[in-house]
């Protein structure tokens, strides 16, 4: 684990407040400590939503992300994804599979359907094994009637409504 010396320099110069730096460092630690206890089992390493997304989901659930960052990620991921997909720079066929905040904040939002979603997501990794995907995990946890495409659209709509407040 490492912290950008440029970021630390911004704290020293006063460009970043000590409170903001403390908040960010706490969030980074939550993310990295999640990896220590994370089960990835037989999940293909090409499933970045599982590894990095899960760590950011826990970070978000623990209050390690600002509301503004979470909302902006939901609202801006589409343009980022479309741009990178056109140029062939994304290994993810679906936007919700993008690692870190994009999939992570979405996973955390899915707790609105099941408050125990993140724990069950970890269980799904063991239960589904090499067949694991976020799409399959969502249906394993919430039921066959829940389509990830519809949930993603609802998540973005929720972010839009929060952004207006």
List PLM regions with ranges:
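General structural signal for secondary-structure boundaries
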Residues: 4, 21, 77, 82, ...
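Zinc-dependent metallopeptidase catalytic helix centered on the HExxH motif
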Residues: 1-74
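Short helix/loop segments within enzyme catalytic domains
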Residues: 61-87, 110, 115-127
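Pan-zinc metallopeptidase signature
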Residues: 97-165
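Active-site/pore-lining binding-face segments in mid-to-C-terminal subdomains
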Residues: 82-103
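Intrinsically disordered, low-complexity segments enriched in small/polar residues
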Residues: 5, 78-79, 98, 153
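Soluble non-cytosolic domains of exported or imported proteins
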Residues: 19-28, 45-49, 94-101, 112-115, ...
